[in-house]
């Protein structure tokens, strides 16, 4: 690939949104680390892959060696209750349970071999739908026993566990999955609710994405195309369905069940105004160094997709050892925080009449890993905000965006319900209308980009014209040292 330009599926603005939210939740929760992966359901394209703490590959020596790896593909964790999505999909596909069938949850406990497994709450009888909604371990164990270990193993493999996703990132783990022949008397029950199996974050989001993709397991895609410096196309990577894992009908039924988790179950904090969300929480005990499971350390996670019936984003949020609230509900709130502005940025129209719709958050300008690698060097087309908030008396006052990198300027403009059009690459050196003018929602907002420190409208237009004549710059560029622009205050 020497000398060639690699175009990624990563969207710099979505990466920035994810990194900003993860930094905040790590700071506030005291979590050891946090991860977020956003995927486009129908193609498997990875739109964002963020981890905190992260490191700058230009200055890797400034970070501990443990931060150098891409934990989304190298680190293995027991998923906990998010894995119930896989158990439920297998059970529905095999016809061993129906949504309204009543399941005996044994007053919150069940004997498996010589051990007693308990629920987080005492449940007597729940429908299968409620077993998922309220995340009953006992109920899922009952259902897994109907499947049996051979069929359970078949579906776990079909959803991509126990093998690399082949995303072509270095050191990708295949996870941990023992052959069914070596399962103990408890293994089937444990796997049903996400124990005794090790998965990578990318495996988990890819598996649940199969439900969003109408039953197809899609190969995760990180590279869109490779071009020569002249612009000649060298390689183009198309979406790759790996296999169908469940029928379209099963995927639709699972979607309805997962919508119930967010509407009135353990995942209510994942709700996004104006959109139907489908997803599942997970609260997984971490393994204890002395054996067994820790009583104090947990991995909180949420995986889901939105809009539920016409998905545009599948996302996984993972928080490692947060203090205080260590449940999947905490991860669900981060899911909503990341997904809501992402939907608006992508121009996904709301599907529900929920009164006043939210708009994209006013993301503060921060120096992120994405900005270090690309410095905002991308020529953009216009982006039209799909969601308008309430009318502002007297109109919208145009913000001053001078000095901001492209991604932050776009987020800020959409947050103000303006329609940005960008010319050139780099930082904002000119804008029209000017700052302070009152305009209506949806007004076209021209942002002219150039090198940090450039001034003057004429120079900005010349820079933009030169950029257009020279062609589009790939994102991200090869890592290089770039001085950061001065901090902007707004």
Name each model-derived stretch.
Residues 30, 95-96, 160, 347, ...:
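Glycine-centered loop/turn motif at secondary-structure junctions
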Residues 1-33, 55-58, 63-67, 237-241, ...:
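Extracytoplasmic/periplasmic proteins that interact with beta-lactams or build/remodel peptidoglycan
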Residues 11, 15, 204, 327-340:
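Short, charged, low-complexity patches
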Residues 274, 307, 317-320, 329, ...:
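Ligand-recognition elements built from short beta-strands and adjacent flexible loops
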Residues 22, 136, 339:
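Short amphipathic alpha-helical/adjacent loop interface patches that line ligand
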Residues 1, 10, 36, 40-81, ...:
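Beta-lactam-recognizing serine transpeptidase/beta-lactamase-like catalytic domain environment
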Residues 30-34, 104, 220, 422, ...:
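Short, small/polar residue-rich loop motifs at catalytic or cofactor-binding pockets
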